[in-house]
Amino acid sequence: MRFADRVALVTGASRGVGKALALRLAAEGCDVVVAAKTVAPDAKLPGTIHETAREIEALGRRALAAQLDVRDDAAVERVVAEALARWGRIDFLVNNAAALYWRPVADTDMKRFDLVMSVNVRGAFACTRSVLPSMIAHQFGHILMLSPPVDPRGGSGKVAYAISKFGMTLIAQGVADEVREHNVAANALWPATLIESQATIRWGMGDRTLWRKPDIVADAMVGIFAKEPRVFTGQTLIDEDFLRAEGTTDFARYRCDPDHEPPRVGFGFKLQAG
């Protein structure tokens, strides 16, 4: 186990990519703060923080199921304080919680715009700000944003979402410079292809021939967190490219449909009209 007795906080960890990342960190030896809004089962939207926590405990690690809406500053501070009171440190923060809304500017309701901004960029900022004092005190930490390289051509059809996600990347780059001397890293990671999740299913983003499993994001995350923080920081990474550089050659194992290699779309995927 690469991260024995480290502590990780993963937002949006009740399902999908966030859950996969939380479980992978547990498998690598971490105790995990499972932070998300969902506490009760919902037939339309599977997964709760308690279900993820139980699966982590089944792996032999400790879990803290923490109900968290990242838009609530007091709740963010409370969850971080509870984790520190229980385990004394937070070594890894994964800013995965997200609001997904893809519409042209003319069709974007301002309430939706505010939601996307408050969850994605403001929520990531709040969580990052809250964990930094502990990471600096311990002279160790990795912060990971699930956000893409900034591309001014990538926002068509999803401008509000693009602004919020690019904002997360800019947070990572700024924080990297601010805390490098304290052996704390901040990086951004984005998938080369669509990833199977409730988001891709509910928003009709093609079918399983176009998707990879969340495992590829988890493998890239583990590789990033294994780096020396003060050395490997301020990076904007694509999962496949990072893993290839690290020596991975078998990407077929990440396919959702074993007979189809998903195309690389990066941040440029567009929903079909209608």
State the predicted function of each range.
Residues 2-87, 101:
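Short-chain dehydrogenase/reductase
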